[in-house]
From Swiss-Prot:
This is DNA replication licensing factor mcm4-A. Its main location: nucleus. It comes from Xenopus laevis. One of its GO terms (biological process) is mitotic DNA replication initiation. Hyperphosphorylated during mitosis in a mechanism requiring cdc2-cyclin B and other kinases. Undergoes dephosphorylation after exiting mitosis, existing in a partially phosphorylated state in the cytosolic interphase mcm complex which associates with the pre-replication complexes (pre-Rcs). Complete dephosphorylation inactivates the mcm complex, preventing its binding to chromatin. Becomes actively phosphorylated during S phase once the mcm complex is assembled on the chromatin. This chromatin-associated phosphorylation occurs during the activation of the pre-Rcs and is independent of cdks. Residues 54-68, 79-94 have a biased composition (Polar residues). Transmembrane segments: none annotated. Early fractionation of eukaryotic MCM proteins yielded a variety of dimeric, trimeric and tetrameric complexes with unclear biological significance. Specifically a MCM467 subcomplex is shown to have in vitro helicase activity which is inhibited by the MCM2 subunit. The MCM2-7 hexamer is the proposed physiological active complex. It holds the Pfam family MCM_N. ATP 2 binds at Y466, K511, S512, N613.
Amino acid sequence: MSSPTSTPSRRKSKRGRGSNPPTPRGEEVQSPPSQKRRTEDSTSIGELLPMPTSPSGDIQSPLFSSPAPSRHSAHQSELDLSSPLTYGTPSSRVEGTPRSGIRGTPARQRADLGSARKVKQVDLHSDQPAAEELVTSEQSLGQKLVIWGTDVNVAICKEKFQRFVQRFIDPLAKEEENVGLDLNEPIYMQRLEEINVVGEPFLNIDCDHLRSFDQDLYRQLVCYPQEVIPTFDMAANEIFFERYPDSILEHQIQVRPYNALKTRNMRSLNPEDIDQLITISGMVIRTSQIIPEMQESFFKCQVCAFTTRVEIDRGRIAEPSVCKHCNTTHSMALIHNRSMFSDKQMIKLQESPEDMPAGQTPHTTILYAHNDLVDKVQPGDRVNVTGIYRAVPIRVNPRVRNVKSVYKTHIDVIHYRKTDSKRLHGIDEDTEQKMFTEERVAVLKELAAKPDIYERLAAALAPSIYEHEDIKKGILLQLFGGTRKDFSHTGRGKFRAEVNILLCGDPGTSKSQLLQYVYNLVPRGQYTSGKGSSAVGLTAYVMKDPETRQLVLQTGALVLSDNGICCIDEFDKMNESTRSVLHEVMEQQTLSIAKAGIICQLNARTSVLAAANPVESQWNPKKTTIENIQLPHTLLSRFDLIFLMLDPQDETYDRRLAHHLVALYYQSEEQLKEEHLDMAVLKDYIAYARTYVNPRLGEEASQALIEAYVDMRKIGSGRGMVSAYPRQLESLIRLSEAHAKVRFSSKVETIDVEEAKRLHREALKQSATDPRTGIVDISILTTGMSATARKRKEELAQVLKKLIQSKGKTPAFKYQQLFEDLRGQSDAAITKDMFDEALHALADEDYLTVTGKTVRLL
């Protein structure tokens, strides 16, 4: 690196190449009207280019753009001494933002200023005679420096931010968002105290607070984030180490602004937003693997072994062409294991459905996260992203330096915020301690102690839907879920804790409304429709990565809703191949993939809430559930609860339903709020129970479950029917655990088993009742046929066998003649389907075979 002090003749030669008039004192700084491109011999990429103001303007000028001077530099800025940490970390390394350059802001949109080199700040007091006077004190030096191309006076900006941190008190602050803080004291001073205690050097700044405190400072942050944020870093570190001089942090405190007022819809981003701070929202649909990105390259001369370091500027490495020690050209070689790298991750963000205009497909944008922001979000998360909008050129050919005129855009992430006010709180390791205050937990526990809490929570679920109390209770237990059990260390594997529910019945009975309500409530919910879903759309598909051109796995709806609920409407209209992928997910909670050389097993710990309509558009009470919705029995047996939602066609019911619907339109909001539990309380209640309550089976509850299962088996054994399978016992265990979670109980008790048994029995009464006998027969769901139907089929086969034997040794019979003989012999009505079933039963016994219209004996 060249010396910061230069001879007057050298400085004059630089002025001759790009002369600019001096900037008047006190006026707003403007970008120079003209400045020709600097040649390669002026300075290296790691140096500051002097501004053409005065001969004294480049003497020991400190660096205030994104990175501070390299730690290998001989001259350190005086301002760097205010903190025990070195301000040598570029913003691209710590915030995910590339180093400060000269492109992007309105004053920099000129073709002749396209250099990516760092530039020195403008010296407003260029008429001072001596360099010694310029560096007399830190204060006098800071007040004279404005970052080139902006109106950001570094000293004033730093002073304003320090005043903001030390004085700002939010009058509209809520206790839920500021857990453990005194709202009458400066918020961000308490945040710095948290940093001292916890040791995480990140200070999140709400831009709304900054805007209410200082409009001009907020405007500078939005317009020039890559210059202002490092200044904020310096100010925050100075305050912190003045208060806590003995504190030791991993690295300097990084300020992370969020909630920028310049919140943009993803499709409305345009060139005027480039290099500005923006906040957008969406759903993460894909994350890449971690990519190492070089931040500082290490070069070694192959002749004299002289070494030098070069910092990377926006992905460009400026290899030194001449060794400064021996003056040998093209002798510098890059040493990879001595270079510095940082973590980088590419994230694809998709537009939220609620932000999409009518008739449009969702837009996607690319995010780049760096260092500790890597792996902060997973596919399926809904996030608000604050970052800097970037535009980078695309080369016509990788081997040619020419670039296209159309640029490629992305967002460098500064801050993630996983919040959605309409949904349940998604609890992760970073937020679980801050989510619930002691006061909030006390309110929730007081609510849990009430005897009617189960009914109150069920009534608060979809209050606009009339009646269906048992169905709402079943969905409520699905939201709570059972206790996750892992016995893999004992060789027994994992047992699923998720509850699967199927709603089937007449059209217009609020099935889809219930699905939409649950989808909008849970944080990792996915909503799909039967005809609009394919097997790969539900599971995973292989595609080429646009960056690396390698085959990668894209996850589908079931994997994206891991630890959530997947709502599937029109379940009966799914293709057979699409439904087949659900078998493994609904029982083993995993998804096995073997495609295009990619063999893996993905987690799909999701609850399935499905809705199906009958084949004949209206439920036929004379048919079984299998015959009505035409779903395979192997799939139906995996649902814990199957509810029928039928239209009773009763005048009294119709009158009550109409009164309820009309009341939704004329009742005031206050009346509706008084009737039902507060929505925020419901969300907190479910989130707390899912996170902290893990009930275990007690001795009494275990005995009650055993008795319930034995009784269910005993009911069917007398009539030759099976009324329960081990899957029904596991369903009872999950429902009992979920009911214990509703009570915030750490132990499953007898009342939980009784409610689970009642709910399970109510569901079976509707879905597993034999229409001919009116008796519950679980084999309808497990084998697709009731015990009476199976018995009738066997009896008819034996009658047909005797009829054939009575005809002597005739080797073949006509199909129609045999059918008419059987109908004439039997008193009961025999349909052609029943006759075919009897023939198939005898064919399975190798007694006969059917070829065309002829029945031949074997």
